[in-house]
Amino acid sequence: EWKAGSALTENKNNGEQLRINLITDVGFTKPINLSIDAVPIPLLGNDYNRKTEINTYYENVRQVFNSMGIEKSGKANSFVFKSISEALNTLAVSHSDKKQLIVTSDLRENSPLYSFHNQEMLSILKKSPDSVKNIFLTKYPLMDLSGIVVFLYYEPVDYSDSDVFEIIADFYVSILTSHNATN
């Protein structure tokens, strides 16, 4: 569950900012920002009010995640790497103590740059992942991702879907770890 990585699980007086970007056919969306402020002086805080604030924050996050599953893709394109790289580079320059990116996607890029829906291009990825890596990183460079933890979540529909996801996820993990992110 996403709450396990929350700064609030470590200390209820912490603050937290959560930014959610959807991967779409146009390559960018307006981010959804949710936050809860840190308690400035914990000794003067009200435990009951803080618990209510935290529960409200968690409920707002849960509602956003639940609403994301409602819209079905079925779109012609998906700019997966662009969206992920922009989110990672934003985190790389952030001064937050804890940086996490949660990606819920099949990771199947389908853009003018590359398509994991194309069997020939998927074969190239299997045989020569470094050449595909160079294509993506030339177009969308990544900064040093030290201190960023990335979670890749997807629920495959069948064995074939799972197999393809594993290939693409391994590709992403290779890119992420080469830029010092952890997963």
Residue ranges and their predicted role:
Residues 1-96, 99-103:
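Von Willebrand factor
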Residues 1-6, 78-85, 122-136, 164-174:
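Well-ordered, non-membrane alpha-helical segments in soluble/globular domains
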Residues 8-12, 89-95, 139-144:
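Surface-exposed acidic, glycine-flexible loop patches that form ligand/cofactor-binding
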Residues 87, 98-110:
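DG-centered beta-turn motif at the end of beta-strands
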Residues 156-183:
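Von Willebrand factor A/integrin I-like adhesion domains
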Residues 108-165:
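VWA/integrin I-like adhesion module and closely mimicked acidic/polar interface patches used
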Residues 14-20, 99-102, 141-156, 182-183:
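Hydrophobic beta-strand segments of well-ordered beta-sheets in folded domains
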